[in-house]
Every structure is written in structure tokens, then in C-alpha cells.
Regions:
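Active-site rim helix/loop that mediates acceptor-substrate recognition in acyltransferases
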Residues: 65-83
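Generic structural signal for secondary-structure transition and capping sites
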Residues: 55-56, 78-82, 146
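A short, aromatic/hydrophobic, helix- or strand-capping loop or linear motif
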Residues: 59-64, 83-90
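Helix-loop element at the rim of GNAT/NAT acetyltransferase active sites that forms part
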Residues: 49-63
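Acyl-donor (CoA/ACP) binding surface of acyl/acetyltransferases
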Residues: 3-45, 49-52, 86-197
Length: 197
């Protein structure tokens, strides 16, 4: 393992003995493993799949143009680790790139906070990869220090992302209008996680 990689392993709970109305143990034995790799110059094709596809950007105001994706790729490659980090999510099972997770510094309600976002390709959705990757990114943000709070702003219509926030321990602050991308407003939930709590 290279020093710059982060691994996540989620092992679901497995009862030691059968209990009334429990899910059979055999359905709870899968292990989800992902590796977070710092974003690099060769990751633009993944970015095109994540942000150039209307289905992938349904809750983000629609796909980005080729020029917007190229500019984003440059920003990702040049991001200062003191102000945020961008990771390619690799599914350890297949060795394939499954998506991205990133966090960055922003001002929110008069204070500096981290904001986090994630995206997983359709072929890898519904398998726990987003949860494993986001949990690892949260650990990285906590280790980086700097800010107490981490916020996520999924669209109120994005059920899976809102469920993931709840599962990872974020507290729902409020529902509000949010501008993303610039010039496009949508109704979002403001989820907050206390990294020092």
C-alpha cells in the first residue's frame, strides 16, 4: 500500500446467535473495501463519467460542459491539501475506479467549515461503496484538523445521499435553498457533522 492511499473496510454486524426476526446471518457477511487515492492527472475520464452524464448529475443542476470539466480537473489537481482534498474511489474487489469523494474549505454562516461531496458510478451504486468512501474521507478531514464542522448539502430529492448522511452520523440542521452550480438554485438539506465531538 502506498503511503498516500486510504483504505476503508465496513464489516456489517453479525449476531452471535439467532434472534427473533433477525436477518439471517448469511446475508450480513459481505465486506466492503475501498481505497481512496489522491486525484491525479489521469483521472479526467472518471470526472467526465461523473459530471458529464445527465443521469449522474440529476441532483446537481445537470451535466458540465467539456470546458467546465477541464477547469475542474485542473482545480482538483492543484488543490492545496490545507484547503481540501480530492480522492478517486477504487473498489478493491474489482480494482476499478468507482467514483470520487472530496472535501474542501468554505465559509458557511460566518465561519470556516469543511464541505463534503461524493459521487459513485451507477455500476457501483447500492453496494455500500459511497458509505465506505465517505467514512474514510471524514476520517481524513478529522485528521487534517483545521475545522470543527463538516457539512453536506444534498438535494432534498436525493434520497440515497440524505440517507447516507443520516447513517454516517450527520445531524440535519435545516432545509434551505442552495446555489450549485453557480447560478442554479436548488432545495437542499444542510447536514452537519461535528468532527471533534
Amino acid at each position: 500500500m502506498r503511503a498516500c492511499e486510504l483504505h476503508a473496510v465496513i464489516v456489517p454486524w453479525k449476531p452471535s446467535r439467532p434472534a427473533h426476526n433477525c436477518v439471517p446471518t448469511s446475508t450480513l457477511t459481505s465486506v466492503i473495501e475501498v481505497t481512496l487515492v489522491p486525484w491525479g492527472s489521469g483521472d479526467r475520464p472518471l470526472l467526465e463519467k461523473l459530471l458529464g452524464d445527465p443521469a449522474m448529475t440529476e441532483h446537481l443542476g445537470g451535466p458540465e460542459t467539456a470546458e467546465q470539466i477541464a477547469a475542474r480537473q485542473r482545480r482538483y489537481e492543484q488543490m492545496n491539501p490545507d484547503t481540501g482534498r480530492v480522492f478517486k474511489v477504487v473498489d478493491d474487489d474489482s480494482g476499478e475506479a468507482a467514483g470520487s469523494v472530496l472535501y474542501w474549505e468554505r465559509e458557511w454562516r460566518g465561519q470556516q467549515v469543511w464541505e463534503i461531496g461524493w459521487s459513485v458510478l451507477p455500476a457501483f451504486q447500492g453496494r455500500g461503496i459511497a458509505g465506505a468512501a465517505t467514512a474514510k474521507a471524514i476520517d481524513a478531514a478529522r485528521a487534517d484538523g483545521g475545522h470543527r464542522f463538516l457539512h453536506a448539502f444534498p438535494s432534498v430529492a436525493n434520497g440515497p445521499s440524505n440517507a447516507l448522511c443520516r447513517k454516517l452520523g450527520f445531524a440535519l440542521v435545516e432545509e434551505r435553498d442552495f446555489e450549485y452550480p453557480k447560478g442554479h438554485f436548488m432545495r437542499c438539506n444542510d447536514w452537519r457533522l461535528d468532527l471533534f465531538g
